[in-house]
């Protein structure tokens, strides 16, 4: 991830106790910063390989609140984001540009540069989409997207909203229902 999006600075979240209790900590951070600066210099502004398509994370917020897909503090358990944390961590180091889209984006037409849509979260939450999945425009747009070669990945309870005898509204696409 650091090679794909180089850092200009490193912060350690206000853990001043690290500096006071372990004097060698500052020296080690200085060494790490030096290594990153060397990587920047060696890269000479070149970009790393990126897949020819984007991966989209689909939730109720989309780009407006992309930070809502995860929580900032990694050591505190958040039930609502548990499913998504591993997905976002994996994507951060992979050769994909990631875009966050919402259901209005899907209704308006899935952007042509998106090759995979990921829907992650618990049922009936803004993370997975809740009642958006009973909107025929949404499910039709994603079925068409997959039919034309796009990928759809679900984690947790994707597309979940009990409706017309189905729990996962795209069970036909995913090959599984609850």
What is each model feature region?
Residues 16-18, 61-64, 123-125, 158-162:
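Solvent-exposed loop/turn segments at secondary-structure junctions
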Residues 109-131:
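Short, well-ordered secondary-structure micro-motifs within conserved domains or adaptor modules
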Residues 17-22, 104-109, 131-132, 160-162:
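Acidic-and-aromatic substrate-binding clefts and catalytic sites of carbohydrate-active enzymes
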Residues 88-110:
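A short, well-structured beta->alpha microelement
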Residues 5-9, 51-53, 94-99, 112-116, ...:
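Loop/turn elements at helix/coil->beta-strand transitions in domains of secreted/extracellular proteins
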């Amino acid at each position: 991830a650091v090679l794909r999006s180089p850092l200009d600075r490193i912060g350690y979240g206000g853990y001043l106790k690290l500096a006071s209790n372990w004097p060698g900590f500052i020296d080690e951070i200085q060494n790490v910063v030096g290594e990153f600066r060397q990587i920047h210099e060696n890269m000479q502004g070149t970009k790393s390989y990126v897949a020819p398509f984007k991966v989209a994370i689909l939730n109720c917020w989309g780009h407006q609140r992309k930070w809502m897909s995860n929580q900032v503090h990694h050591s505190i358990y958040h039930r609502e984001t548990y499913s998504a944390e591993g997905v976002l961590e994996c994507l951060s180091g992979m050769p994909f540009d990631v875009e966050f889209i919402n259901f209005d984006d899907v209704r308006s037409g899935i952007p042509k540069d998106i090759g995979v849509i990921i829907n992650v979260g618990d049922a009936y939450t803004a993370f997975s989409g809740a009642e958006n999945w009973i909107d025929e425009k949404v499910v039709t747009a994603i079925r068409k997207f997959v039919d034309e070669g796009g990928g759809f990945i679900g984690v947790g309870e994707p597309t979940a909203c009990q409706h017309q005898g189905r729990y996962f509204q795209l069970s036909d696409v995913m090959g599984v229902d609850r």
